[in-house]
Design a protein with these regions (language model features):
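Amphipathic alpha-helical regulatory segments at dimerization interfaces
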Residues: 2-8, 61, 65, 90-91, ...
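GAF sensory/regulatory domain recognition
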Residues: 3, 14-55, 76-77
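Signal-transducing coupling segments at domain and membrane junctions
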Residues: 58, 67-68, 72-99, 121-129
Length: 175
């Protein structure tokens, strides 16, 4: 889902974050710029990022408000925005985030399961440009598929947990 979304809108990077209690944690991260620099077998360093769900950071803002954000330049946010761009992830990964579209992953009841974040749309010359309205529609379409995948994963996980719990109650003498 993330790969196809990025391909359709021609974005360099992206992530899927999942809500875990009061935090939002990156589950899938892709970055074509960094992928080219990795040695064989080496993985991207994004799996360690986790943020509190609040309106101070972009992912937390989208997860807490349920509103998508289309940001032209993360380093040039107006002073009056309630959220800020966390430069630490760029510093830690030696990357330069500019344009970003962040979309909430909501189920049918409106519960936020996670966030889809697409980063650095590229033009035909490889320059970073802003995401447009058409990109927003495409990303929203793929977000629906991401929600379905997350819901399926949650249901499967819950079913396995129930089966394990039921197995604990089984009397081994009965078999």
């Amino acid at each position: 889902i993330l790969t196809e979304t990025r391909r359709i809108v021609n974005a360099d990077a992206g992530s899927i974050y999942v809500v875990e209690e009061d935090r939002i944690k990156i589950k899938y991260g892709q970055n074509d710029t960094h992928l080219k620099e990795l040695a064989p077998g080496e993985k991207l360093p994004y799996s360690c990022f986790s943020f509190p769900i609040n309106e101070k950071q972009i992912c937390g803002y989208v997860a807490s408000t349920g509103k998508s954000l289309n940001i032209k330049d993360c380093y040039a946010l107006p002073e009056d925005t309630p959220y800020k761009f966390n430069k630490n992830s760029d510093i830690m990964t030696n990357y330069r985030t500019k344009s970003m579209y962040t979309f909430p992953l909501k189920n049918a009841t409106g519960q936020i399961l996670g966030v889809l974040q697409i980063i650095n749309k590229l033009d035909e010359n490889g320059a970073v440009i802003a995401f447009d309205e058409e990109d927003e529609l495409f990303i929203g379409h793929f977000a629906v598929s991401a929600v379905q995948a997350l819901q399926h994963a949650y249901l499967t996980s819950n079913m396995v947990k129930r089966m394990l719990k039921m197995a604990e109650f089984r009397d081994p003498k009965e078999t």
